[in-house]
């Protein structure tokens, strides 16, 4: 089998490339996905409110675990990644957050990455998006990804939480993806007008999969990339339960889009990476790149949970006798509780003046429950998910064997810097202050978790060690740049090799301020033009907010938070 391009991984970036490259009917593409189809009849992946279900099994989740995390009481922590057409966009929380403009401007300060500034990238965010309330300078109106904006009146807790943030002295913003990210406001989400999850399989592949020049293979586990000298010329994979490898040749390029965990694994198995690591497993060295699998980053977060004094939370939706009605409303009308991910309010703030742009993110949820659906509080409640955005901690992904089905050694080194601890202490204390603002007086009861007895630095630190969780945002393991630890250049081409690019969240030099899916899709759109040799979309002229020394908040609070 021969194709112009072979794409490894049908996720948030791979599906973008498959769709854009096959717009030319003379270009042939093979798309390999280790998982299965995105079954449209399976409510677990298609109903937004069911977002916890895919994380509970292994049909749609690789369900990786970390090595014991040394600064987290040696816990082995979850590292869920999407498996199936859509990748992690098939199982994520559907929050459509692009990050802060200064994240991208920060990338663009690196020599050779100048065209990754916010204004260079904004046209590609817009190209990917159809926003339900219409296009403007920041949002698209005819892209493949459906974006739904929170509307007033859905749940009084959303508006109360935003108002409480404003009463605490932080800005209000009407669009976390628009002119000003900093502040509290409604959150966009990747949900269709009919209340279905808007994964990249639905948005992109649905328009491309009928093309004769696109071949899609599911249950195709990539073993390794085939090289002729320093040039990538094909891919070898295993289909289903078969132990007999299948091969295909790439006439132009191999495009690795397997994500921040699997992409470095595949490179290492293919002979690209740290020479010492490859020698441990007798893998012939194709090219030494010590940065492969290094620079691993993530967002860590925790929940602050509160009793809700008014019966307005989603607690009744957790009762089995209410779920048939919720399911029917969603299935037949695309409406009701089932049609939302319920992350409809959030915010970004600076915890201290030293940060030039927000370093803390909030997701508000009108129920008290773990992200994966476990440990639901058996009463009306609500919670804040809060965590730091740009931790200096760095980890790694390293193969444990040559076998493609063997999970790698993953270590994030969460909380390995003093800055991490300071940010989380600040985050807990600020959240408590916000929760005690007048807007929430009629709703908030006792603090369920961590509990008012948890006050000192030592007590807060122990709570974080025992209870903080991943936000499922790994990135950075095939870093874009030109220093000695970078893996790809500014066009995704792997240093020292030909015919091979990496296009996914692994190329982010530094993690962004927010959820990763929207930016991973943008990377796919921008790289698609580079791969095709097309001129980049014209640079945006839209303005964007820079704090530039403005106070973190307008006033200090004097209310007793205990």
Curated annotation (Swiss-Prot):
Where are the catalytic residues?
A: 473 (proton acceptor)
Among InterPro entries, the record links this protein to:
BetA (IPR011533), FAD/NAD-bd_sf (IPR036188), GMC_OxRdtase (IPR012132), GMC_OxRdtase_N (IPR000172), GMC_OxRtase_C (IPR007867)
- E.C. number: 1.1.99.1, 1.2.1.8
Q: Which SUPFAM superfamilies match?
A: FAD-linked reductases, C-terminal domain (SSF54373), FAD/NAD(P)-binding domain (SSF51905)
Q: Where does FAD bind?
A: 4-33
Identify the enzyme class: oxidoreductase
What keywords sit in the KW lines?
A: FAD, Flavoprotein, NAD, Oxidoreductase
**Pathway linked to the protein:** Amine and polyamine biosynthesis; betaine biosynthesis via choline pathway; betaine aldehyde from choline (cytochrome c reductase route): step 1/1
GO-annotated cellular components: membrane
Catalysed reaction per UniProt?
Answer: choline + A = betaine aldehyde + AH2; betaine aldehyde + NAD(+) + H2O = glycine betaine + NADH + 2 H(+)
What cofactor is this protein dependent on?
Answer: FAD
Provide a GO biological process annotation.
Answer: glycine betaine biosynthetic process from choline
A GO molecular-function annotation: choline dehydrogenase activity
Q: Report the domain of life of the source organism.
A: Bacteria
Query: Any keyword Oxidoreductase?
Result: yes
Pfam families for this protein: GMC_oxred_C, GMC_oxred_N
Q: Which PANTHER family match?
A: CHOLINE DEHYDROGENASE, MITOCHONDRIAL (PTHR11552:SF147), GLUCOSE-METHANOL-CHOLINE GMC OXIDOREDUCTASE (PTHR11552)
Primary role: Involved in the biosynthesis of the osmoprotectant glycine betaine. Catalyzes the oxidation of choline to betaine aldehyde and betaine aldehyde to glycine betaine at the same rate.
NCBIfam families given in the database record? betA, PRK02106.1
Family of this protein: Belongs to the GMC oxidoreductase family.
Would you tell me the protein name for this molecule? Oxygen-dependent choline dehydrogenase
The protein's organism comes out as Escherichia coli (strain SMS-3-5 / SECEC)
| The encoding gene | betA
């Amino acid at each position: 089998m021969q194709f112009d391009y072979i794409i490894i991984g049908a996720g948030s970036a791979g599906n973008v490339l498959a769709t854009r490259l096959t717009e030319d009917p003379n270009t042939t593409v093979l798309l390999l996905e280790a998982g299965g189809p995105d079954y449209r009849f399976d409510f677990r992946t298609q109903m937004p409110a069911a977002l916890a279900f895919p994380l509970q099994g292994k049909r749609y989740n690789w369900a990786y675990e970390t090595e014991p995390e040394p600064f987290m009481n040696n816990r082995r922590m979850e590292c869920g990644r999407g498996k199936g057409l859509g990748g992690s966009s098939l199982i994520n929380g559907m929050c459509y957050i692009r990050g802060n403009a200064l994240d991208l401007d920060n990338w663009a300060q690196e020599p050779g990455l100048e065209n990754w500034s916010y204004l260079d990238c904004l046209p590609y965010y817009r190209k990917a998006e159809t926003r339900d309330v219409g296009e403007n300078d920041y949002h698209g109106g005819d892209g493949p990804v459906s974006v739904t904006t929170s509307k007033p009146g859905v749940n009084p807790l959303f508006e109360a939480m935003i108002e409480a943030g404003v009463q605490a002295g932080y800005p209000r913003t009407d669009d976390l993806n628009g002119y000003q990210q900093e502040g509290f406001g409604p959150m966009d989400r990747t949900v269709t007008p009919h209340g279905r999850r808007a994964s990249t399989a639905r948005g992109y592949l649905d328009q491309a999969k009928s093309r004769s020049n696109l071949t899609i293979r599911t249950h195709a586990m990539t073993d390794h990339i085939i090289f002729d000298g320093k040039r990538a010329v094909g891919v070898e994979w295993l289909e289903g339960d078969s132990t007999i490898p299948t091969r295909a040749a790439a006439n132009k390029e191999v495009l690795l889009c397997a994500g921040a965990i699997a992409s470095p694994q595949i490179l290492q198995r293919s002979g690209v990476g740290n020479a010492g690591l490859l020698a441990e497993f007798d893998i012939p060295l194709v090219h030494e790149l010590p940065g492969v699998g290094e620079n691993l980053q993530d967002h860590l977060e925790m929940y602050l949970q509160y009793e809700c004094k008014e019966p307005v939370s989603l607690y009744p939706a957790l009762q089995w006798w209410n779920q048939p009605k919720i399911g029917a409303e969603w299935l037949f009308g695309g409406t009701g509780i089932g049609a939302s991910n319920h992350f409809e309010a959030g915010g970004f703030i600076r915890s201290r003046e030293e940060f030039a742009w927000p370093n803390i993110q909030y997701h508000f949820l009108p129920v008290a429950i773990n992200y994966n659906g476990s440990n639901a509080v058996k009463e009306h409640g609500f919670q804040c998910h809060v965590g730091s955005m740009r931790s200096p901690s760095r980890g790694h992904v390293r193969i444990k064997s040559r076998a493609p089905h063997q999970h790698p050694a993953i270590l994030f080194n969460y909380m390995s810097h003093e800055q991490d601890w300071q940010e989380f202490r600040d985050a807990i204390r600020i959240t408590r202050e916000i929760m005690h603002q007048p807007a929430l007086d009629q709703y908030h009861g006792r603090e369920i978790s961590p509990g008012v007895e948890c006050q000192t630095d030592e007590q807060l630190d122990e709570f974080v060690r025992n209870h903080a969780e991943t936000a499922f945002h790994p990135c950075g393991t095939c870093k874009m740049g030109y220093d000695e630890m970078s893996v790809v250049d500014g066009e995704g081409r792997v240093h020292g090799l030909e015919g091979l690019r990496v296009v996914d969240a692994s190329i982010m030099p530094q993690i962004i301020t927010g959820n990763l899916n929207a930016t991973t899709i943008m990377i796919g759109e921008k790289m698609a033009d580079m791969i095709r040799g097309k001129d980049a979309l014209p640079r945006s002229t839209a303005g964007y907010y820079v704090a530039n020394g403005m106070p973190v908040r307008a006033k200090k609070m004097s209310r007793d938070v205990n």
